[in-house]
From Swiss-Prot:
EC assignment: 3.6.5.3
Binding residues annotated for Mg(2+), in chain numbering: T26
Localization per record: Cytoplasm
Function noted in UniProt: GTP hydrolase that promotes the GTP-dependent binding of aminoacyl-tRNA to the A-site of ribosomes during protein biosynthesis.
Region (G4): 136-139
Family: Belongs to the TRAFAC class translation factor GTPase superfamily. Classic translation factor GTPase family. EF-Tu/EF-1A subfamily.
Name of the molecule in the record: Elongation factor Tu
Region (G3): 81-84
Keywords: Cytoplasm, Elongation factor, GTP-binding, Hydrolase, Magnesium, Metal-binding, Nucleotide-binding, Protein biosynthesis
């Protein structure tokens, strides 16, 4: 059976489980891999294998995350599950595991709890585009009215944070029953219903190569007789030789023409997402471009200085600050390839931020950066990472 080959042709989607502690996220993850692998191939993962999540580092922050994969009839999924609440917060803010959609797991016996709410808010803040719900432990609730009540609460909660609560798929089931091979409605069939909902509710993500061109500037060289070469890794899209591009951020935006693309000292017709290239720019002086700017498709990204964000502040144990900070704190914000100083404004009623906290705050930079909602950044003091954040809403 040439199964492998077939798998690669399926669209790939990144998802993850979110929700309150002990509502069954890891059990559901195990149930999905077990039930779907029996039908579509792939590897079943046991609860203990997922729960013993390995450590990884993202933006200088240590996060425990378990990665599993599974297939449905139409797609290949990569799925992340985190053991602890703090890991979720860090994961979502650093974008260590970018999610095209999230499965919110909520125990039918308990209903929405504080972390249920917090994870929905985080999903909204960090720009997870789709959330669907698995109402777990339905075997523990005999009262149909109670199930309806929990479902209503969940829909209201989703709507409150600007998700389409009324249209969100909510699947009733029991991850444990499904894992045990139970064939009743809340057993294995609930996992297939969840798989169908994932396939139909989360659209195919737009591939990086199909998005508008953007390349963060890492270095600038002057090559006599040829002009100025800007190097970096293409983040998304394609740049073709002869195309007009913009240089955005730090200084006023300028337009230029890309007159050449080279990679490994060879000339190419184009550079695309994932390529490390040197782009030759027409009529641009070496001192007109600097690290921290981006090359992009004209009009696709604007420079901004003022925005709201969701940030996670490293704890002392993670090598972060030992003391809290207050309103007006002025660290550096590291966007893509460079640091920019900025000041922070805490939400009303918040006096200070302790190491280990996550919080929504407004940031004002002293120089504009090419920015979109969902852009990740690090917070640094003298080159040392003290936090991580994501742009939630641009103000100006």
């Amino acid at each position: 059976m040439a199964k492998e080959k077939f798998a690669r042709t399926k669209p790939h989607v990144n998802v993850g489980t979110i929700g309150h502690v002990d509502h069954g996220k890891t059990t559901l993850t195990a149930a999905i891999t077990t039930v779907l692998s029996a039908k579509f191939g792939g590897a079943a993962k046991k609860y203990d294998e997922i729960d013993a999540a390995p450590e990884e580092k993202a933006r200088g922050i240590t996060i425990n995350t378990a990665h599993v994969e599974y297939e449905t009839a139409n797609r290949h999924y990569a799925h992340v599950d985190c053991p602890g609440h703090a890991d979720y917060v860090k994961n979502m803010i650093t974008g260590a595991a970018q999610m095209d959609g999230a499965i919110l797991v909520c125990s039918a016996a308990d209903g929405p709890m504080p972390q249920t709410r917090e994870h929905i808010l985080l999903a909204r803040q960090v720009g997870v585009p789709y959330v669907l719900v698995f109402m777990n432990k339905c075997d523990m609730v005999d009262d149909a009215e109670l199930l309806e009540l929990v479902e209503m609460e969940l829909r209201e909660l989703l709507s409150k944070y600007d998700f389409p609560g009324d249209d969100t798929p909510i699947i009733h089931g029991s991850a444990l029953k499904a894992l045990e091979g139970d064939q009743s409605e809340i057993g294995e069939p609930s996992i297939f219903r969840l798989a169908d909902a994932l396939d139909s509710y989360i659209p195919d993500p737009e591939r990086a190569i199909d998005q508008p061109f953007l390349m963060p500037v890492e270095d600038v060289f002057s090559i006599s007789g040829r002009g100025t070469v800007v190097t970096g890794r293409v983040e998304r899209g394609i740049v073709k030789v002869g195309e007009e591009i913009e240089i955005v951020g730090i200084r006023p935006t300028v337009k230029t023409i890309c007159t050449g693309v080279e990679m490994f000292r060879k000339l190419l017709d184009q550079g695309q997402a994932g390529d490390n290239i040197g782009a030759l720019l027409r009529g641009t002086k070496r001192e007109d471009v600097e690290r921290g700017q981006v090359l992009c498709k004209p009009g696709s990204v604007k420079p901004h200085t003022h925005f709201t964000s969701e940030v996670y502040i490293l704890s002392k144990d993670e090598g972060g600050r030992h003391t809290p900070f207050f309103n007006g704190y002025r660290p550096q914000f590291y966007f893509r390839t460079t640091d920019v100083t900025g000041s922070i404004e805490l939400p009303e009623g918040t006096e200070m931020v302790m190491p280990g906290d996550n919080i929504a705050m407004t940031i004002k930079l002293i120089a504009p950066i090419a920015m979109e909602e969902g852009l990740r950044f690090a917070i640094r003091e003298g080159g040392r990472t003290v936090g991580a954040g994501v742009v939630a809403k641009i103000i100006e």
